[in-house]
């Protein structure tokens, strides 16, 4: 069982180690096993004396002895045994594991199976030990990289997502964020968007207010864009892109902000109409940078002006520009975005018509919307259910009524207002008649 080091060691072995290490080095040249045995004797003495500094030196020496001679199986065995020794110091175990990790990193020629076996040994030794949780996380990441190179994405995602790095108090914030971002990315590659969403909530967005996390912020919001695109949550995509757009590294470089601002426009026009969508699209319209993007500016203007649009004309005008964009409209994968854009155009037209007409025939409405009767009724039903417009369809008469019926309170208020207005007019007329009578009386005299 491991333990914390006491404030003061029972005995200082530093001088003894200085004398013994040269002898052990000499012995190791001919008999590695005997050298290892002597080091294990020293390890026991330093451990029992609670001499942390000397214990670290001995454990590091054991790692050097075995790793430098490629005795990785022996190293795995010693790492397992020494970590279980009674009274073993926590910091000594941590130091030994760190030394093994250094050798793993520097041994580029090490065969894959051996590398995996050492990583797995470290993972077993560090399991459920808080004082080596960071080391466990780092070797797990190395194992995940190997799995990714082998194309085992699902396995890599499962291994990495086991780590609850957000609870690691000894890990730097930037490293925590990097781990969670990689967990999110692997979950997306695996196709588990629900897990990716859960993982994204482990990062506090206010953390990104610190400029030193700017690159991580961009990576984080790009991953959120992928998640929301999969869910077809266009308004969320636009909001995440806006966070990217507001980042100094993007805002200061025209080559970077132009595509981001274009994407914001595209996903705002793809978003269903609502208070937030309407607010955001008007804010974007007032952005001075939008003037440098002619096509995008004119597209925003179409959706913020109370005028009807013809879908065939919109498609013909913007198709060449929009098809160049791989994220929003280009390629077969984004074909459904064109369908959604057509829906938004029709919904915009229906809102405009509901403002200008109190009643309209279905035949005329079909002509204005370029739709069949059943399609028109479907769109009316959808917008009514969303609470965006009021409409009632009289099927026998084939008339659509957009005028909302007034309740008793509204009718009473309107009647009261009309009566007040009528009395004011009567009073004004009375004054005018009196004035005329006076003028006529003066003229008669």
Swiss-Prot record:
Belongs to the proteasome subunit p55 family. Keywords: Acetylation, Proteasome. Pfam families: PCI (PF01399), PSMD12-CSN4_N (PF22241), RPN5_C (PF18098). The keyword Nucleotide-binding does not apply. Present with 5710 molecules/cell in log phase SD medium. The gene is RPN5. GO terms for biological process: proteasome-mediated ubiquitin-dependent protein catabolic process; protein deneddylation. N-acetylated by NAT1. Residues 233-407 form the PCI domain. This is 26S proteasome regulatory subunit RPN5. GO terms for cellular component: COP9 signalosome; cytoplasm; proteasome complex; proteasome regulatory particle, lid subcomplex; proteasome storage granule. The modification N-acetylserine is found at residue 2. SMART domains: PINT. Acts as a regulatory subunit of the 26S proteasome which is involved in the ATP-dependent degradation of ubiquitinated proteins.
């Amino acid at each position: 069982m491991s333990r914390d080091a006491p404030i003061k060691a029972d005995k200082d072995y530093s001088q003894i180690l200085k004398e013994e290490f040269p002898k052990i080095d000499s012995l190791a040249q001919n008999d590695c096993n005997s050298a290892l045995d002597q080091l294990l004797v020293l390890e026991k003495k330093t451990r029992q004396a609670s001499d942390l500094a000397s214990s670290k030196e001995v454990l590091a020496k054991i790692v050097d002895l075995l790793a430098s001679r490629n005795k990785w199986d022996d190293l795995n065995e010693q790492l397992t045994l020494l970590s279980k020794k009674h009274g073993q110091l926590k910091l000594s175990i941590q130091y030994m594991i760190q030394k093994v990790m250094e050798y793993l990193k520097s041994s580029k020629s090490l065969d894959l199976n051996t590398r995996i076996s050492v990583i797995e040994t470290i993972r077993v030794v560090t399991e459920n030990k808080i004082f080596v949780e960071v080391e466990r996380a780092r070797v797990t990441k190395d194992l995940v990289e190997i799995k990714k190179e082998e194309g085992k994405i699902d396995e890599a995602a499962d291994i990495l997502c086991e780590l609850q790095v957000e609870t690691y108090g000894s890990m730097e914030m930037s490293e925590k964020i990097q781990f969670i971002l990689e967990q999110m990315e692997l979950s997306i590659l695996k196709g588990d968007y629900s897990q990716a969403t859960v993982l994204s909530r482990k990062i506090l967005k206010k953390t990104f207010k610190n400029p030193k996390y700017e690159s991580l912020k961009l990576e984080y919001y790009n991953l959120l864009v992928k998640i929301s695109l999969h869910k077809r949550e266009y308004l969320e995509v636009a909001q995440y892109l806006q966070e990217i757009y507001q980042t100094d590294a993007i805002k200061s470089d025209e080559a970077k902000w132009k595509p981001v601002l274009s994407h914001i426009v595209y996903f705002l026009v793809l978003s269903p109409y609502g208070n937030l969508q309407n607010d955001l699209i008007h804010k974007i319209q007032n952005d001075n940078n939008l003037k440098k993007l002619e096509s995008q500016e004119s597209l925003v203007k179409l959706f913020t002006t109370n005028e009807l649009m013809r879908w065939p004309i919109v498609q013909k005008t913007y198709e060449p520009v929009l098809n160049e964009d791989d994220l929003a409209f280009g390629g077969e994968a984004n074909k459904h975005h064109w369908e959604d854009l057509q829906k938004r155009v029709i919904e915009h037209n229906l809102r405009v018509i509901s403002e200008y007409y109190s009643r309209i025939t279905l035949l005329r409405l079909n002509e204005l919307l370029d739709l069949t009767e059943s399609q028109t009724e479907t769109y009316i039903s959808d917008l009514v259910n969303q609470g965006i417009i009021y409409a009632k369809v009289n099927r026998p008469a084939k008339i659509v009524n957009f005028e909302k019926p007034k309740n008793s309170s509204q009718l009473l208020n309107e009647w009261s207002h009309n009566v007040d207005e009528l009395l004011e007019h009567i009073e004004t007329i009375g004054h005018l008649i009196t004035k005329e009578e006076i003028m006529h009386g003066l003229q008669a005299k």
